């Protein structure tokens, strides 16, 4: 049975989103084929990515935040969404630290439960 999920996610930086998708092994595409299920919904999105079995995660930006549309199965959807949001947060932090120039990432560690710990230091 086909399933389409839509949730609001706190993603604002399209470039960092693209990096996070790539890091998770998803590839960006311009659009999905017209014959593809839910193509109308996906093709209205600003960023479209597919996984190895052609399941889609698509992002439509509305008022500065992203709506995530996906046809992943519910369990896969939640797992992939959580991994994506974590990767996005890590990459956004690193980008922000680099842009600010006052801080530097000193250490990054992934804990056994999957939590990412990042140590940022300030040079004075």
Identify the residue ranges that each predicted region occupies.
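Interaction-mediating elements
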Residues: 1-124
């Amino acid at each position: 049975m086909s399933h389409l999920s839509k949730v609001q996610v706190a993603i604002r930086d399209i470039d960092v989103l693209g990096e996070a998708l790539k890091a998770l092994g998803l590839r960006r595409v311009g659009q999905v084929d017209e014959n593809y299920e839910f193509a109308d919904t996906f093709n209205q999105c600003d960023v479209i990515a597919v996984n190895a079995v052609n399941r889609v995660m698509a992002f439509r930006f509305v008022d500065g935040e992203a709506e995530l549309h996906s046809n992943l199965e519910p369990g896969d959807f939640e797992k992939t969404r959580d991994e994506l949001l974590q990767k996005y947060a890590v990459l956004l932090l690193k980008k922000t630290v680099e842009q600010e120039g006052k801080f530097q990432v000193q250490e990054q560690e992934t804990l056994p439960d999957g939590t990412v710990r990042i140590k940022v230091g300030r040079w004075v």
